[in-house]
Amino acid sequence: NEGIAPETEAILSAAARAQLVEELIKPALYDHNIVVADRFMDSTIAYQGFGRGLDLMFLQELNYLCTGGLKPDLTLLLEITPLMAQKRKKKDKPDRLEKEGIDFQEKVRQGYLHLARENGERIKVISAGETREKVIKQAMQHINSLITERWGN
């Protein structure tokens, strides 16, 4: 739905996240597995909070409710300007959020960067403007550091 209200978008995202947490994430963590997700609670703050202008405190409480307080141990933020991202993706058809335009994407980007500044111990920023090899190397360094910190060599 292209004309979805920001509040509805936030609540639907939270509902999907709550289901994901209950069905997949909690059981995996209970079985001592490492869980990797491509988006999680920070996306709500960046997209609905910074992008759509919804109240950040409301969104934080919504995140807490739908995740049961679970937070990622590590978040890798692949940082790129909206213009560069758009140029890279020019072959693909834009999704609903990409159709919002550069101004919206920049608000979301600034939201993610704000979260990274506020949560530097958890959110690691990687320049996605670098080569694929450099991005992968940086990501693996952060992942390996966390594994070493938690479980040793």
PLM region descriptions:
Residues 1-67:
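ATP-dependent small-molecule kinase phosphotransfer cores
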Residues 39, 44-110:
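A glycine- and Lys/Arg-enriched "phosphate-lid" helix/loop adjacent to the NTP-binding pocket
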Residues 83-153:
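NTP-dependent small-molecule kinase module
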Residues 36, 74-76, 124-126:
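Hydrophobic/aromatic beta-strand patches that form the interior of the parallel beta-sheet core
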Residues 10-12, 77, 96, 125:
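Short aromatic/hydrophobic contact patches that present stacked aromatics
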